[in-house]
């Protein structure tokens, strides 16, 4: 099972728009990928809500796509909290992950991607080599969809490679 995680809890974020684009592009490759947004993530500790998320989403997933906005040179703390609450061995060990950075700045959350790569390696995850930092995100989207052909092709190529990974 593939799961795309929009790693911010901000409502109406560009991150979620990008995650939906990834979901659509996976569908074009006949790969069903569920989308999990942290917009409604409310757990501050292991609770019934979190246990359900872990059992129904995290544990069954074999391949993850993390869409990560840049927050203070890294990725959102709410995503780190979710990871910290989880059973690391069941939720993350030996699973595959594709990393995507999203930012209005020039680097496309490259530092956050690097930081997450280190975390994923610590959690024994296999990180796909082609990481995509998408910079100037406000200029990349119109009506919640990518508008630049070069970005569309980069995303589609990344997805095709990840499917083979």
Predicted features along the sequence, with ranges:
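Phosphate-coordination loops involved in phosphoryl transfer and adenosine-cofactor binding
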Residues: 94
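Short, glycine-/small-residue-rich phosphate/pyrophosphate-handling segment
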Residues: 97-137, 150
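N-terminal beta1-alpha1-beta2 submodule of the flavodoxin-like/Rossmannoid cofactor-binding fold
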Residues: 1-88, 145-164
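Short amphipathic alpha-helical patches
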Residues: 49-50, 81, 88, 105-110, ...
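Mobile beta-alpha loop/short-helix "lid" or hinge segments that flank ligand
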Residues: 31-43, 88-90, 122-142
């Amino acid at each position: 099972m593939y799961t795309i995680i929009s790693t911010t809890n901000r409502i109406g974020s560009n991150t979620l728009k990008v995650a939906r684009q990834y979901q659509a592009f996976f569908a074009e490759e006949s790969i069903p990928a569920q989308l999990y947004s942290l917009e409604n993530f409310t757990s501050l500790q292991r609770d019934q809500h979190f246990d359900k998320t872990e059992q129904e989403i995290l544990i069954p997933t074999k391949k993850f796509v993390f869409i990560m906005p840049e927050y203070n040179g890294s990725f959102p703390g709410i995503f780190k909290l979710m990871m910290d609450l989880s059973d690391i061995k069941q939720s993350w060990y030996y699973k595959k992950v594709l990393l995507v950075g999203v930012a209005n700045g020039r680097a496309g959350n490259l530092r956050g991607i690097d930081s997450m790569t280190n975390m994923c390696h610590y959690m024994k995850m296999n990180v796909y080599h082609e990481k995509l930092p998408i910079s100037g995100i406000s200029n990349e989207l119109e009506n919640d969809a990518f508008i630049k052909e070069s970005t569309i092709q980069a995303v589609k190529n990344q997805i095709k490679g990840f499917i083979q990974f």
